[in-house]
Amino acid sequence: MKKTGIFNSEISRVIAKLGHKDKIAIVDLGFPIPSHVERIDIVLDFGRPTFEEVLKVILKELEVEQVILAHESSKKFEQIIKENIPRVEFLKISHEELKKLTNDVVAVIRTGDVVPYSNAILVSGVIF
């Protein structure tokens, strides 16, 4: 049995295969996920797990060099990301553009978060 890290086998597998500049998305409960993109649905209940809970676990194993989020996202949402990834580069685009970009991600992790626009695309970085 695995002792540390991410215990969700699907998330662990996806992170392990990411290369530099590959992208994954973490999205809220209502985000439309393209049918051709791998969906990892971890919703447990309305509101659970939150975006932040999922982000914290993912950051244990993933080096992130850029976060793409919607202009419509709240300042609080942006602050959550800044607190968890202090020196990350941000790219802000429209929510419609963000939805289109999810066509090119390796996987989408669907959370139970119900705060509008709690969606981000994480761009994989390098550890050296």
From Swiss-Prot:
One of its GO terms (cellular component) is cytosol. Transmembrane segments: none annotated. It catalyses: beta-D-ribopyranose = beta-D-ribofuranose. Its main location: cytoplasm. Keywords: Carbohydrate metabolism, Cytoplasm, Isomerase. Disulfide bonds: none annotated. One of its GO terms (molecular function) is D-ribose pyranase activity. Its EC number is 5.4.99.62. SUPFAM superfamilies: RbsD-like (SSF102546). It is found in: Cytoplasm. The active site is at residue 20. GO terms for biological process: D-ribose catabolic process. Pathway: Carbohydrate metabolism; D-ribose degradation; D-ribose 5-phosphate from beta-D-ribopyranose: step 1/2. Coiled coil: none annotated. Substrate binds at residues 28, 95, 117-119. Belongs to the RbsD / FucU family. RbsD subfamily. HAMAP family: D_rib_pyranase. Catalyzes the interconversion of beta-pyran and beta-furan forms of D-ribose. Homodecamer. This is D-ribose pyranase. It comes from Thermosipho africanus (strain TCF52B). The lineage of its organism: Bacteria, Thermotogati, Thermotogota, Thermotogae, Thermotogales. The gene is rbsD.
